[in-house]
């Protein structure tokens, strides 16, 4: 292919260099690859030697993009792969994921627990809504089931009661049947099971579904 005749630092990017072969611009790469592949002026470079350089160039680009994405918000493995797939090949993405996992920057179990805690403590969601939110974030079914398996039933009941009381203040002037229906629908939307909804309504309103 030719002889490397110059390796030039880019003026506007300290992390990148321009490689010239036979006195003509050949390629721009990350500076660290010069050391990784021991590239020097006077070295001959051929097609076989170029491929791993280009692969590592794409790997660094993909890794940098992934780190930038993660700097804004935690991502599941699935969602991060989806965001990288428009620009990078699968083998490059897998290398990036392996790197991120090695530093615990991508960990679906940890992410799932964070989402559960936020949904329970801040958003007052029930188990069904939490499971759907986890699925929407790209968490797999087994990790979802593990994350919600330790949900505290008393806390879930307290959250449902809190939401029911707030909704009751908005609908308390309506007739008994409508109050029951509207609170029930709201709690169902928030992801609570029928049994919890029934217990909440019975305690809050002193009647159950058979009274209406």
Curated annotation (Swiss-Prot):
Gene3D superfamilies assigned: Winged helix-like DNA-binding domain superfamily/Winged helix DNA-binding domain (1.10.10.10)
UniProt record similarity statement: Belongs to the RecX family.
The protein's name: Regulatory protein RecX
Regions that span the bilayer: none
GO biological process, one term: regulation of DNA repair
Entry function: Modulates RecA activity.
Cellular component per GO, a single term: cytoplasm
Regions annotated as coiled coil: none
Keywords, ordered alphabetically: Cytoplasm
């Amino acid at each position: 292919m030719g002889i490397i005749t110059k390796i030039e630092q880019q003026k506007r990017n300290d992390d990148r260099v321009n490689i010239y072969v036979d006195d003509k611009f050949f390629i721009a790469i990350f500076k660290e690859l010069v050391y990784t592949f021991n590239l020097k002026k006077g070295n001959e470079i051929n097609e076989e030697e170029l491929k791993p350089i280009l692969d590592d160039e794409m790997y660094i680009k993909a890794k940098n993009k992934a780190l930038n994405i993660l700097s804004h918000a935690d991502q599941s493995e699935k969602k991060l792969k989806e965001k990288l797939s428009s620009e990078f090949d699968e083998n490059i993405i897998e290398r990036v994921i392996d790197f991120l996992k090695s530093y615990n920057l991508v960990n679906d179990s940890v992410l799932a627990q964070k989402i559960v805690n936020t949904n329970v403590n801040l958003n007052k969601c029930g188990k069904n809504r939490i499971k759907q939110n986890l699925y929407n974030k790209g968490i797999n079914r087994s990790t979802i089931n593990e994350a919600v398996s330790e949900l505290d039933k008393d806390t879930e009941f307290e959250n449902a009661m809190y939401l029911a009381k707030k909704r009751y203040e908005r609908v308390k002037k309506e007739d008994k049947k409508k109050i029951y229906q509207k609170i029930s629908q709201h709690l169902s939307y928030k992801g609570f099971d029928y049994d919890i909804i029934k217990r909440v309504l019975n305690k809050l309103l002193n009647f159950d579904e058979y009274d209406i």
